[in-house]
């Protein structure tokens, strides 16, 4: 498992190096589609709600396993300054905690789109691509004022 995460991190680093010649875009610039966010919402209801709660606020009930908020300000503060490629690698290889790495690439990217939608980030015309170079070029940041 550790070697798999290390390999994914190295691939992500290579993608970041490749993307550095292109001006990054913000998660606030419509980087996913509404349909992608909806697929992520359906996945969340089936596989994520028991840990992250129905509103993605993290463990809100004593019977829930400890888990962080994965949307809104808490999520943005934790991930600000990183790119979506890093988030994709994290979700893809560590979720769900009881069966890490079992989400497909598509499920992982759809889950991220849902996190963005719940965080108030606007949908756009193009889906988040399962492409480390493209994802490395999308910056997670607080909403511009």
Language-model features, listed with the residues they occupy:
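Bacterial N-terminal signal peptides
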Residues: 2-13
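Compositionally biased, proline/threonine/alanine/serine-rich low-complexity intrinsically disordered stretches
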Residues: 12, 17-28, 137-145
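Electrostatic cytochrome c docking/interface patches
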Residues: 18-43, 59
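Gly/Gly-Pro-rich "capping" loops immediately C-terminal to redox-active cysteine motifs
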Residues: 31-34, 55-90
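Sequence context surrounding c-type heme c attachment/ligation sites in exported
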Residues: 38-49, 63, 81, 105
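The canonical Cys-X-X-Cys-His
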Residues: 40, 44-55, 111, 115
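Flexible coil segments in periplasmic/lumen-exposed cytochrome c-class electron-transfer proteins
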Residues: 100-145
């Amino acid at each position: 498992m550790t070697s798999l995460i290390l390999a994914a991190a190295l691939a992500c680093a290579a993608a970041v190096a490749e993307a550095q010649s292109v001006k990054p875009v913000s998660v606030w610039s419509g980087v996913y589609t509404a349909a992608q966010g909806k697929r992520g919402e359906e996945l969340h209801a089936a596989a994520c709600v028991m840990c992250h709660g129905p509103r993605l606020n993290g463990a809100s009930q004593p019977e829930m396993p400890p888990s962080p908020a994965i949307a809104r300000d808490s999520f943005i503060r934790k991930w600000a300054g990183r790119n979506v490629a890093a988030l994709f690698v994290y979700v893809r290889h560590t979720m769900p905690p009881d069966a890490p790495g079992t989400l497909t690439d598509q499920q992982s990217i759809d889950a991220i789109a849902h996190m963005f939608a719940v965080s108030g980030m606007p949908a756009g015309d193009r889906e988040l691509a399962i492409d480390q170079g493209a994802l490395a070029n999308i910056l997670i940041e607080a909403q511009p004022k």
